[in-house]
Amino acid sequence: MGAIRTPRDRWIEEGLRTLAAGGPEAVRIEVLAQALGVTKGGFYGYFRNRAALLEEMLATWEREVTEGIIARIERDGGDARERLGHLFDFVESGGLVTSAGVEMAIRDWARRDEGVARRLRRADNRRMDYLRELYGAFCPDEADVEARCLITFSLRVGEHLIVADNGPRDRADVLAAVRDRMLS
């Protein structure tokens, strides 16, 4: 009986985990193999080299933060406000690929790599388009739609970077109030 190979997705997932922890420079085949508890030989059954893995990591991230999330939200159904509520919920509880750590690592990487920057812009534009579609379904004012989209997306990108106290309220209460205001 042959040895069981480490699935391709596990290499990508571990690559994204390592990216979130240490940036693209930290994503090395030997490090990933050690984290997965395997030899690096299995890596080459899926990827030509490290650059091919990095490309697949980016493709996986882009697909999941755009069409993957949109498909989940649309599958849950409901009117635009309900779907936005599902989106807020999902972003708070999403998995590794859609995590804030991976998001921030890719944004940082994009500052130094034009190819990553193009992919990030494409993903951001797709996410903003989806928000416009949802907010536009119940906000008649185009400026209001754009403001809500920017606030919602800024919250996604930056909320975990803010370490300020929220006065007598805890962060969860404040985020719930923001959500209620955005959906009103």
Label each region the model flagged:
Residues 13, 59, 81-96, 105, ...:
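Amphipathic alpha-helical segments that line or abut small-molecule/effector binding pockets
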Residues 98-104, 114-139, 147, 173:
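Amphipathic alpha-helical packing segments from all-alpha helical-bundle domains
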Residues 59-66:
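Short, basic, alpha-helical segments at the C-terminal edge of helix-turn-helix-like DNA-binding modules
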Residues 10, 14-52, 56:
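Helix-turn-helix
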Residues 12, 66, 85, 125-132, ...:
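An amphipathic alpha-helix signature
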Residues 56, 70-100, 148-152:
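Hydrophobic alpha-helical connector segments
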Residues 1-6:
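N-terminal intrinsically disordered/low-complexity leader segments
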Residues 107, 142-165, 170-181:
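Hydrophobic alpha-helical segments that form the core
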